[in-house]
Amino acid sequence: VSHWLAVITQTLVLLLSGAALFLSSWIVVPAPTMSLLPLGVGAPEVSPWLVMINAIASLLVLVTIRRTPWQFLALAASLLALLLSVLPLLQMPATQQHLAAAMRDGLGDYSVNLPSSQQKRMRQQPFVLADVFRGINPGESRYTSGIVFSQPDGVPLSMDLYRPPQVGNYPALIIIYAGAWRSGDPTQNADFSRYMAARGYSVFAIDYRHTPRYRFPAQLDDVRAALAFIHQHAAEYEADPERIAIVGRSAGGHLAMLAAYEPDALPVKAVVSYYGPVDLPGGYANPPRPDPIDTRAVLETFMGGTPATMPDRYRLASPISYVRRSLPPTLFVHGSRDNLVQLKFIQQMHQRLLADGNTSVLLEIPWAEHAFDAVFQGLSNQLALYHTERFLDWALR
């Protein structure tokens, strides 16, 4: 009995070591398919958990397995997994310094006029290790769902509204969700919406029509309609129409920039784009490798053709085409490991904005993949949240 118990124990430890190495490997290995992308997104964000698991696995290997080739293999796997899982934490101090410098370079001494009452509501540190384990409390807010703002082609489009606990007149955030223009709904990233509402914003999470039934510019038309509706009904929903910012993720970031940058755009005070595409012809010509989402197929579905067959439409659908002077201040938050929207295009956009005299801040997170903030308490979102709320306070103050 003791022999078989030992065999079972050793087998379980070997499996634990192998599983931990498999999970930890996605911190550095790009996901080749959409089915594996959640591992590439999540592994860096929960890496402190993986550090703990890998440390335990290493100890169990030493304690439970005799000196055999299997033990050395299991120990090597556990130690390699431990090394991989600790990489984001090792990068954290330098990353915090780089992000703080990027904020100062873009905004100057932005915290000088930050009211102490507002600062107390914000995160006090860019990164708190304990929050990875215990989570981040979004705080209290009022929630109203299903506010219909438009019915294009008879399709009702609605928004969800998050407001601070007390009635008032607040700066407004328009939240546009991700989903490659083909999926998603306003309930995505609800923790972020609740968090910002609890800290003094009226937050409108809006819907838009999807491909393949509706192609560009239908999605942009829907964002315009939402923006016009919010301007018209601002008092009813406790929003200050003079202090509106648009926050978008991925496809939503793309739409946010277009809605803010177009020459005839309704006025907004700031734009925040989390990993949003900016150059559609460039992205089509130079897709990432590997390309888990099949970039060209997504763009062809969204646009209704290729850049060769409809170059003007691709140009009009690219935020980089609208760069000129006097655009709203823009914050880009992007992962260096983003394998859907490549960082190099965002860097080009950032430099173009600066060259034309605009305010632009680019926060690059070295270990982060696309959609990193899907893990709300993860390493990357803690950094993003800390700086995003300060950028928005600066822009909407």
Describe these PLM feature segments.
Residues 339-348:
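Conserved alpha/beta-hydrolase "acid-adjacent" motif
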Residues 326, 332-334, 338:
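Short beta-strand/loop motif that positions the catalytic acidic residue
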Residues 23-54, 58, 114-167:
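N-terminal cap/lid segment of alpha/beta-hydrolase-fold proteins
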Residues 45-46, 184-193, 204-243, 262, ...:
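Catalytic nucleophile-loop/oxyanion-hole region of alpha/beta-hydrolase
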Residues 26-30, 225-288:
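Primarily recognizes the serine-hydrolase "nucleophile elbow" in alpha/beta-hydrolase
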